[in-house]
Amino acid sequence: MGRRSRRRGEEQLAAPESPYEDAEGNVLVLRGAMTPATRAQYAKVRAGGLNQEDAWQRSVEFLFERLAVRWTIAGAEPIERQKELLARFRFAGQDERTWIRGTLRTHLAEHFPDLTPP
């Protein structure tokens, strides 16, 4: 009982967040931290037994799934739940996917220069 009550007063650490806005005003917020386990999983996805195109698509989806925190589209209520973010990503059109891929590349270069972008 004593340990639980001591933890309640502590602030939880939060990963830094970086917002990226497209030309239409949509805002994608990406997490600025990645665990060593996530980095190892990403390396497996990139080197997996898939053909190059499939590995590339899967690596973009993997990074989006792990790094996306919030996505505000057309001024609507932001999407924040992981399942909803991933579903919206899968529903995205070609232009949105191109922008997301470019945004992920920029984000990796700024925050994770040791990782190979998709």
Regions found by a protein language model. Give the residues of each.
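Short acidic-hydrophobic surface loop/beta-edge motif
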Residues: 13-25
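Short Lys/Arg-rich cationic patches that frequently serve as NLS/NoLS or arginine-rich RNA/DNA-binding motifs
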Residues: 1-13, 40, 44
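Short, surface-exposed, charged amphipathic helix/loop patches that serve as local interaction elements
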Residues: 26, 31-118
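RecB-family 4Fe-4S metal-dependent nuclease core
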Residues: 8-15, 57, 72-73
